[in-house]
Every structure is written in C-alpha cells, then in structure tokens.
Amino acid sequence: MRGSYRMMDWEKTRVINMVARALQYLEKYEIDDINFTHEDVNPYNLKEGLEALGYEWSDSEDNRYDFWWYFTKENEYTVCVFFDAQTFELNMSLCIHEDEEI
C-alpha cells in the first residue's frame, strides 16, 4: 500500500535531523532548492519529517510531478516538496504559497 511504511525510531530521528538541517541551509544561504537522492529519503519520510517539525501538509493541484506538497507552519516559510517518480527527483524549497501575501 502506498505510503504505509513506518520509519523506525532511529530512521525517523535521522530524517528529522536531515530535514531540519536542509531547512536551515535553505534559509541561511538563500539557495533555491535542495535535491535529495532516494538513498537519503523518500517522499513519505520527508513528509513525516516535516510534520514532526510542526509543519502542516497540504496537497497541490499541480500535475507536473507525482507529488507536489506544501507544508506550512505559523511564522515560518512555506516549504514546497515535489517528487518525480520517473527521475526519482525529490526536491525541497522554501516558497510562497499562492494563498500567502508577499
């Protein structure tokens, strides 16, 4: 079943730490995005890591990718995650959601 895999505690800690470092890196160095390899993390683990950091998930209607998710947290950047199953490209960026004011 899609997305039913549950991470072990050590794996969840690794993913949460990796996601937290990636978010800090995106903000500190003002880079556009970070690409993850499928050896690093899969889309569901990345989603779980962001949720563990207090971000709320919402889906996008953008059909260019297999997954295009938004994660929001009060007083924080919106985080966009997209995954292309053809290329295994998993990308995370800080973005402005269409509902947010610039």
Where are these regions (language model features)?
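N-terminal trafficking/processing presequences and adjacent post-cleavage segments
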Residues: 1-43
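Acidic, low-complexity, intrinsically disordered interaction modules
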Residues: 29-102
